């Protein structure tokens, strides 16, 4: 949720054409698919569903697979500069993990969906770490990531960037906070939701964007986003 929103807002403030995909929806199915900040309309979604249905032929798809392929179909036709994809459940076997990301982010590892992901943080962390890719950045947004996440990152060859080791955040007076890493820092307006967890998510979003290949995002876009 919020990490995707931070990445999307900052990239759009930098002038990038951005698509975002989250799940599940709260009120309307249109919510999970955003094209340049605007929810996909009904006609676009219907066209995407029809395209996926035709392409799958006799191959069965789950609800989330169908929705993910539809979002990717729309993104490909719009011609984006950045696609931000949120994993729906776990990571290793999630439909979104079909895509090879330039940067992956794991914010926190909580004990939920235990019937599917495992009984504790170590087991769940191993599932979430499945989104890591060799030689690509893996941003870890909590200080005490499970050892299973770190083991998988190292075994995969991913470049783990860890909160509390590689980047930091701290509150400041006057409604601001500081993000920093070795050799760089930003002083930014406090997020609307100013809890430490939200600052950690915002800090992770900054690291993810700075780790992307290509043109750097200007500092002012981080403040505007």
Enumerate the predicted regions with their spans.
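Hydrophobic positions on the alpha1 helix immediately C-terminal to the Walker A/P-loop
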Residues: 2-7
